[in-house]
Amino acid sequence: KKLVSKYLKEDKSEKKKFKPRIKARIRKNKQILTKNLDNFFDWIKGAELVELKECNTDEDPVRPELDNNFRRSYGRKIYGVKFKNEIHAVMCFAYTNEIPKSVDELDMLSQDAYLQSTLRGQIVGKIAIAYTVWSKKKGGGKLIVKEVFKKIKKSNHLNRLVTLSPLTDMAYKFHSKNGAKLIQVNETTQNFEYKVPK
């Protein structure tokens, strides 16, 4: 009995010592988590969508072969999410009147829409085609989609936001998670559409 009671006493004292350690660790983890969440929301709230003259094409995981000249000619645009003078996410667009199934088609259709725009007072295409997007900071991809979506809703001539995405699970998950619907699967690409309510 004495031996049992001795071990029970030791066990209780160990539990008492152990509990404050757990509480301290939980408290510290909560502080770290709160700080990380605050930092995350600070950057999300303070970020802005800007038009870029160029981007680092080596950072583009989707279409690094397309140079800045391609990305800026025939009315094509490069947008970035800027926070504290740093670009954290990039999305490249072309404007067309039809949905392309490949980069070559995108090039041809955006040139055609651009040439037609000279007759229409510089209104280039009715469909915004997002052909590449990448992020250097967590939440950047989702944020740039949201900001571009707002910009398209405000525009007078754009009525659709469609992607020209690679045939990867990552692209499927990203666009599906952000509210886009898969509209067609092509030989080397897939197109998703974000509904633009007018």
Give the location of each predicted region:
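Conserved N-terminal entry element of GNAT/NAT acetyltransferase domains
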Residues: K2-L52
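A short helix-loop-beta-strand connector motif used in the catalytic cores of GNAT acetyltransferases and
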Residues: N68-K84, A89, A94-V103
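Conserved acyl-donor/pantetheine-binding loop and adjacent beta-alpha core of acyl/acetyltransferases
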Residues: C92-A128
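A short, internal acetyl-CoA/4′-phosphopantetheine-binding micro-motif in the GNAT/acyltransferase core
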Residues: A128-G140
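Conserved beta-strand-loop-alpha-helix junction that forms the acyl-donor binding cleft
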Residues: S135, V162-K173
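Conserved acetyl-CoA-binding loop-helix of GNAT-fold acetyltransferases
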Residues: K137-K153
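Conserved acetyl-CoA-binding loop of GNAT-fold acetyltransferases
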Residues: S176-N186
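C-terminal "cap" of GNAT-fold acetyltransferases
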Residues: T188-K198
